[in-house]
Amino acid sequence: MKIDSLFNIQDKVAVVTGGSRGIGEMITAGFLANGTKVYISARKAPALVDKAKELSDKYNQECIPIPCDLSSMNGIEEFTNEIQNKEKGIDFLINNAGAAWGEPLESFSEGGWDKVMDLNVKSLFFLTQKFKNLLLHNASEEDPSRVINIGSIDGLNVPSMETYSYGTSKAAVHHLTRVLAAKLVKENILVNAIAPGPYPSAMLGSAVNHDYSEIAKRNP
């Protein structure tokens, strides 16, 4: 079954934060393969630019890199302003950029708490706030604009690792999604979240080459 047999996203515009690797890259590739222009962000400019060119060439579709640090309000405003200067409206906002921090309870640092909460929760809220007008521009009752927040299974269950701020942040993402969904549905903007489980990615760090058999047993 092809996506275009279910719905058509040809010539639409998407914003994917953290779009240069992991789940963000997969989402970006899916949009590009189906004719959507995509803006992607990441902190590391060279890798972001290289990935955008790679994806653009592969799918023969525009993938525009905007390097920025979305953990700060300055970074959020620079990112949103740049897209506002290029587009009258957007159809999709994928709040994917995130961070994790692992440390024993007894020594868990304020920096490890704030870094994760700022990027995983604060930036998600303010990006949605600042992109609202662009989402409204393209939204209609027949074809709503959409916000997709990337949560985590660790926001629903008790995490197996000592990633206290990460699990807490993702629980906040899931509840904030409900709150935003109830507010924005009245304006033809649909807000949803997904809750991925563990998979090999740069965020897992040393766990990328981990034996996933035990984790798989706990996955229903």
Where are these regions (language model features)?
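Conserved glycine-rich cofactor-binding loop
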Residues: 13, 20-21
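Substrate-binding pocket helix/loop in short-chain dehydrogenase/reductase
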Residues: 104-105, 109-117, 204, 212-216
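Active-site loop-to-helix junction immediately N-terminal to the catalytic Tyr of the SDR YXXXK motif
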Residues: 108, 158-167, 179, 207
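Active-site helix of classical SDR
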Residues: 128, 169, 177
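Alpha-helical segment proximal to the catalytic Tyr-Lys
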Residues: 133, 182-183
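Residue(s) in the substrate-gating loop at a strand-loop-helix junction
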Residues: 152
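A glycine/serine/threonine-rich, flexible loop-to-helix segment
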Residues: 162, 186, 198-220
